[in-house]
Amino acid sequence: MSARRPFSKWALLALLFVTLVAIDQWTKYLAVERLTTLFERTGAETLGERLAGFLEHQHLEPISTDPYYVWRPVWRMNYVENPGAAWGLFRGHSEAFRNGFFTLVSLGAVAFILHYYRKLRAEQRYLQVALALVLSGAVGNFLDRLARGYVIDFIEWYWWNRPDIRWPTFNIADSLIVVGVALLVLHPGSGKAAQKAGADAEGDRRASTGG
């Protein structure tokens, strides 16, 4: 009996990439559904109509009620359209500049990640997963910018019962990038290449994602 072939690193990347990007986009759809007036205003009822509205409509009106609290002392959901980066960076620049800049940064980060991933050995699963997380997050936010010119953010963390002291609103794609970068930096055998990947990806998160 022939030995069982190990799961290809490219198959692992494809599986994680498709799954994580789908989760990111689905949670953004849920944010639009639960936190904006889009479907009420357009009368969309079926899933197909709502998905079409999610992809086609821009600059949506948030619901007028209080934000949805996951855990009231520290965590709530709040719909935000972020045309810039974290802490409002690049908001003052023109849309054409932002789109061009974020496109170049995102494509550069994706190219670097794939170049580094190609060099990994089949048994380096830890680094494969870390890079897959960063890649999925970068592409998830890039799809937002490509379709709308801004990133949909909705997760809002703040200091204990102090919503005025809060972290910039973010999304699942941002979380994937942060976790992936942390794994790269903390990996004891990652070496200088992984350190460089972490620094490059963190720069992409700040410059080309929503927070």
Curated annotation (Swiss-Prot):
Q: Can you tell me which residues form the catalytic site?
A: D153, D174
**What is the protein's membrane topology class?**
Multi-pass membrane protein
Q: Which InterPro entries match?
A: Peptidase_A8
From the Swiss-Prot or TrEMBL record, what is one GO molecular function term?
A: aspartic-type endopeptidase activity
Q: Which residues cross the membrane?
A: 12-32, 96-116, 127-147, 167-187
Query: What is known about what this protein does?
Result: This protein specifically catalyzes the removal of signal peptides from prolipoproteins.
Q: Which family does it belong to?
A: Belongs to the peptidase A8 family.
Q: Which HAMAP family match?
A: LspA (MF_00161)
Q: What is this protein called?
A: Lipoprotein signal peptidase
